[in-house]
Amino acid sequence: MTLLAAVLPSAALPSSVSGIARFGRTQAGELCFCDRDPGAEYAEVAAGSLVLCTDSLAVTLSNRFPGITCLPVPDPRALFIDLGHSLLAAESVAVSDAVPRPFGIHPGTKIGAYTDIHPETRIDEGVHIGAHCVIHRGTWIQAGTIIRDNTTIGVAGINAYRGLDGKVRNFPHFASVIIGPGVEIGAGTVVVRGITTSTQIGAECVIGNLCNIGHGVEIGERVWMSVGTLVGGHTRIHDGATLGMSVAVKDNIEIGAGAQIGMGSVVVKSVKPHASLFGNPARMVGPIHAGPNR
């Protein structure tokens, strides 16, 4: 609240902030930011949401989303980042409630040498974690999942923003990583935790060696992802999709269910269900036989 008080008149200060969330996904009392017109992307924003925004957006947002509280500031994104880091530094801030309590490691878990697991994680029955892995705070690994050597789960990513003051800031990462049952994650892979929404990997997925899964990515069930695949933040990959070796997927797009993307492709637009793509940029081609059924 000290940071808010420094830039807002006392009359505009909220009495309390219950949490931080992404614009469009807030609940009453939660703080978010909006520094550009959201257009038709969001049909509604919960009444009682606290929105850091520019002066020019305040009237537009208030008219479009009745019941929200707009907090006009010169640089909403920068202030949101600063507030987030301030909250993360406070010991009282809880891990995302997406991870069920109690925390703990199931006694039957197999853990390799020199692996570090934060105490505020949940690891279910039958999980096998290899050597030299790091499992960060706020991770939930469900039953029967295998994580191979040198893998990092739940690390904060690098999502930089240069503020109006010229200072470069990195977004704080509040959310979790949720890995479903029966998943296999290859050696040297990095799964970044979400900023405000959890990074999720569905049941029975196979994630190859040396992959990078960005913040807030949502992967459905039985997705097959080969060696060296890169997936940008907030992308959704639906059930049964197959991504070949060294595929790169842009942030904030969707890969439809059952889609197949050939080796080395660069995907910059959303992909329809059951489509086959190949190339840079990826384009529609004839059927590709990839993944476990090739």
Per-region residue spans from a language model:
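Terminal amphipathic alpha-helical/low-complexity segments used for targeting or macromolecular assembly
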Residues: 1-102, 108, 144, 150-151, ...
